[in-house]
Design a protein with these regions (language model features):
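N-terminal capping segments
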Residues: 1-78, 83, 90-92, 96-98, ...
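Residues that flank catalytic or metal-binding motifs in active/ligand-binding sites
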Residues: 83, 108, 133
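Catalytic Cys-His active-site segments of thiol-dependent hydrolases/isopeptidases
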Residues: 100-123
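Intrinsically disordered, low-complexity, charged/polar segments
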Residues: 124-144
């Protein structure tokens, strides 16, 4: 399923960034991208997503994205990268994890696909500054 995840995620490239959205070609945020790939590969989303603010519960310290990832995705070791992995990022020390992406390439030039706030879904180098922020690595569950 790894390459299928990347193909599905790349279909979202260029989709404008829209907070709380998940509509291919019209608008999405980082969670919306993961939701859209889920729908494309697996089917209906496993739970309704409540409204959320851009700070992702930072004031309360609740790890909402991490909790959802642990409920619905398959946890992987951080040091076992594969194309198609869902990546969870903690943007700064002490903050909640609040950004998601999908690893598209591994090896000497790793890359990931993510919804870039204020812009669109892009494929970016998974440079050292980004890689150091990864706090979770997950796989989509197998269908069925």
């Amino acid at each position: 399923m790894d390459r299928q995840v990347v193909v599905e995620a790349r279909a979202w490239l260029g989709t404008p960034y829209v907070h709380q959205a998940s509509v291919l070609g019209a608008g999405t945020d980082c969670l919306g991208l993961i939701r859209g790939v889920w729908r494309g590969l697996i089917g209906a989303e496993p739970e309704a997503v409540p409204g959320y603010t851009a700070d992702w519960s930072e004031a309360s310290g609740r790890e909402e994205l991490l909790g959802a990832a642990l409920r619905w995705l398959v946890l992987k070791p951080l040091d076992a990268p594969a194309a198609g992995d869902v990546l969870l990022f903690r943007m700064r020390e002490g903050a909640v994890a609040k950004h998601l992406g999908i690893q598209s390439e591994t090896g000497d030039e790793p890359r990931f696909i993510h919804a870039y706030a204020g812009h669109a879904v892009v494929e970016s180098p998974l440079s050292d500054p980004w890689a150091r922020k990864i706090v979770g690595r997950f796989a989509f569950p197998l269908k069925g």
